[in-house]
């Protein structure tokens, strides 16, 4: 990219623009030629304008007559020092050693030049070129007459002014060129600052004239390379920023440059001062190839370096000058100079600085001041030598400490000291916190807190006497250091390291730069230090490279790089790494201190000279840190016993050694030691240590055995076997035999408190209960052992009519409230109370069912018999569905019976005896379903025969069922018989329960509806729905899930499964529909459906009950939803009595599919009477098995006993029965899986309930 300028010209005359496109110019203005016209003599130029300060100016451009301008004279030639690529179109790109003609030096940062071929013109950085002394200056002199011939008036005045200023030293020179050299080219404006606040470009404030003596310029540049020949190959300096310009016309800054050199020679006079406390110099810091102005102050034992600029852009360099830094004079490790350069190396913090003093005199002055202060600071060493020479023999090994803070006496044995007092350390082992010391000046002795003392030296001359040995050891790296005192050895190695550094520094300074740069494989000798291992045995001279993951990386003087574990180095080395990296290594320092303390103790035991522990050494360092804070640390508590405990609670007992002696792996000793010290344990508790204590403190089992063996041997203890537990464990008894946690006596899940008083009497009479109570009141080790639950009675299997009746009622209530088999006694009590209020109806139905059961099994209480019998058997025996239904009614109220859904009664059994329910439901359901199914429906009706519409035959049943059936007839005229059958069933159940149905209606109006629905073709519906009807019937289908849930009859609908679960609280089932719920559950698609819903699916069969009840029950009972799609809605909405209406409505609803039709959807089911259908479905038998209703298999029985049919369907229950309640499909319908476990043929007796027999069958 070529330059936009095609020439540099100078105005010969003034010209005033006469048009907008023309440009005003003055004589001697510098112009950049932009365009030449081939048509006329008007050329386009741009006027050069130099900005002043931060001013931003625009350089105007326009047309001027070509006769008013001429080419600008070349005032100097220059040579490129580095390659440069231009950044803007006004600049020039060039390569190293390119030659240029210089036209203007007015800008100290950017020089206006052109190539020798005069083809390219532009600006180049001033610190990238070097001006040459050539013939151009002579040419410049020849041009001067011309310049004087027509000078502008202001220039005439400026000439004498400049001449008078030539000898002035403070004339501001251009910043860049004076100090620019190939080695340290500095950004312009560096050298032109005044002693206090240098302006970046001071020469801009003065007009420059070409008339100035050119020789001075040449001499200034000619001298430059002399001092820095070795730096010619340096990399290029940073780019200067482009100037903003100034209106000053005169471009000649030559005079200022010559004066700059003179100023450099006098820099020590003009740029340093002394205010009585500090010597101050304004010099430069060199960081690589960059230099920054700094202010160096030395005095008061400090060396302070601060940046010397107010321009934030000057602080870009990341070096010591970018921030204030301060070191104590004693932290100055080495200092030397070479010509104008001063080299300093500090510690705390570590830093290596290179300063450019500007002149050799200034560098020597800085060296002299540093030498005086460093010597004065080291003078205390001479005083220590004098004191050591006077010390007596017994004081040879004493340490000398200095007080960091004032200490006031608070005890008789304490020593009053002031800050700065020096004392002998007499005894520092007796207590870590209080040291016995002797004041060197007063010879008084006493104890002083160890944190107030800083160890500074020793009272002997080991440093002098051990010198030859130390020098010998340094020549063999890694050889054992022969020394008696690790501390003195430590000091020796530090001094030796200092001398080695000084020697290496001198060699490095003398060596050529190129040689040093070539030796990249060797460490930086300026950073080499001596590293000593924690034992003081080995040492190595190496440079620190870094610390990573607990490894200290070092570069040895032989060029080998190594990584040393942090816990293997001395504490001082770790502190050095902490200072350099700013990373905490406390965890490693603690390990080193422990190891050193252990070694010191072992040496003292063996008779070796006791060496100071690393713990104390670290305390010195800690004290030094506290000294920086200038805050006295808290005074430790005075020891009261011979066992000294530090302020942090750590006992003096060496647990580490203890564990080693016990045979514990050394890798675990430290962790165990920390745990014991954290708990403030000392040797006094050794005899009390037990395995449980060790286990609590984190010891491993193997180590626990080792420690206990060691303690037993130490205290001559004989281990006695632990006495066996008196009460045995969780699975064993006192004799060690396996416990039989299952009791021969059935355990009641109902607490004695929840049972009626007669039962309570029985409960209290039981010894097992008392034992359990007594055990519960004991606080023994076997508190977690399995214990038998409180038993209500040993004779639970022996039912007594009176107790059983309330129990039965209570069971019903419990079933209503019980979700899982076991509920709290309180809930059961509440449950008992709740049903007791309506117990008249509930009990009577139950009694009725009991009566039915009684007819089958008189000895047992009416309620119990059906349950125990497995409802099916009793129901079947009853032959009359009525009894069964009544039983169901008893459980749920009659509706259940009437419906098998009515099996709410079954429901009760569900809780008490699900089996009872199932049979009841099965019977009721099957027949209705069978009847509905086809002819069987009628047959079923006959069976129910209550049958038939003759709801009248069974007045009791008629009312509730009538409603139900009423709806059913409406539902499907074809099913009139079925309805009758249904009616019959309900009648049977309802027989005595019609009233209960209302109750059920209340409890679960839906259930009644379901009854109605069952009465309706629900059975068939169920059948139809069983497959599609069931689900299809939105109610049912939905109910299966939702409807059911409403009814709480899980049985219904798909619910059977879902609802059953949902109804886990039988109470829910009952709750919503004690009657309805039950029926719904049992029957409503439930019996089968309830359990598996399959019955629904298969339904008729499995759900004969489901069938009839199935959809109906579900629909009517549960949610009506089931049945209804039709029934469910209406049935639910209407009470039982309304069932008829609902049924009618549902008829329409079911018109979607009359029950028959729905059944027809399942042709097989419709084709087959419910009975047949049930039979067709193997579930029927299964159901029978579930319910254990023999009658299930036989349709007649089925008819007679809805349970049978229900059972037929029960196969699905079986699915339900897969749960423990299988025997009680009804219970399953309700979702009380636990009931299944009870046999159908048995009576429920909650007092005799056990985990295996929750209903006490």
UniProtKB/Swiss-Prot annotation:
> Modified after translation how?
Phosphorylated by the CDC28-CLN3 complex and by PRK1. CDC28-CLN3 phosphorylation regulates cortical actin patch dynamics, as well as PRK1 phosphorylation and SLA1 association with PAN1. Rapidly dephosphorylated upon hyphal induction.
Disulfide bond entries: none
Subcellular location as annotated = Nucleus; Cell membrane; Endosome membrane; Cytoplasm, Cytoskeleton, Actin patch
Instruction: Name the residue ranges with Basic and acidic residues bias.
Output: 189-227, 493-511
Quaternary data: Component of the PAN1 actin cytoskeleton-regulatory complex. Interacts with PAN1 and CLN3.
Q: What does this protein do?
A: Component of the PAN1 actin cytoskeleton-regulatory complex required for the internalization of endosomes during actin-coupled endocytosis. The complex links the site of endocytosis to the cell membrane-associated actin cytoskeleton. Required for assembly of the cortical actin cytoskeleton and for hyphal growth.
Name of this chain's protein: Actin cytoskeleton-regulatory complex protein SLA1
Q: Read off the lineage from the record.
A: Eukaryota, Fungi, Dikarya, Ascomycota, Saccharomycotina
